[in-house]
Amino acid sequence: WQSFDADALLASVPPDVTVIGGLASAADRPGGNRLVLDDAVFSDGAVALVLPPGIGAVPLVAQGCRPVGDPFVVTGAEANLILTLGGQPALRRLQEVISSLPDDERQGNGLHVGIVIDENRSTFGTGDFLIRGVLGADRESGAVAIGARVEVGTTVQFQVRDAASAGRDLSSRLRHHRAKSAIVFTCNGRGSHLFGAPGHDAGQFVDRLGTTDVAGMHCAGEIGPVGGLHHLHGFTASALMLGTDDPLEDRGVPSTVAEVG
């Protein structure tokens, strides 16, 4: 549960600062988590560690969902309610996608919505979306409620959690990196819930980066940059690799690691 407006914070981050982090996930109600800063303990807010430039800091965000069905343009919306998609009731579009899925995916982890990050792209795939949950639907109006506000004209595509796709995306993003250490913020919907065994993401970082200096936490939402902007993600592994030998490592850009209540 979130007691801090992470979206507002991320919207104010200067473009020359990189933020990686996550929402504390232990509590079942707002204010139930405990954040520690030096000798002080807080029940809301955020705690951040600012790292200096020049330490080879490289961010990474790997997705945990796979797009299904076709992308649709939102043609009717109100707050977090999608009223129509491509001129048809959103619930009808949702039902069409569900009916096209294999039985194992239909009965599995539920359907999510991906909100396109870069509308200038002509095609969309894994990694091109902000993932949000489908919260419910109204049969009478055909509206679908999701875990985010959405504007008319936005492109969305329904998504399913997919272990194979998630594993490939993380492995691919780590393939060309070596690092001395990494701080990893992984969704609590990954791990054994997605991969069938604990420690999948940590193991990938250890094996691919060639280091055992990997630390982090399970999150109820992950923070990381995609497409040059910072976003609050779902079902991702967001990490800051340190001491990289990557040619894209930081060029005097400070990094912030944040835990949000």
Q: Whereabouts are the PLM-identified features?
A:
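Small-residue-enriched flexible segments
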Residues: 1-212, 217-261
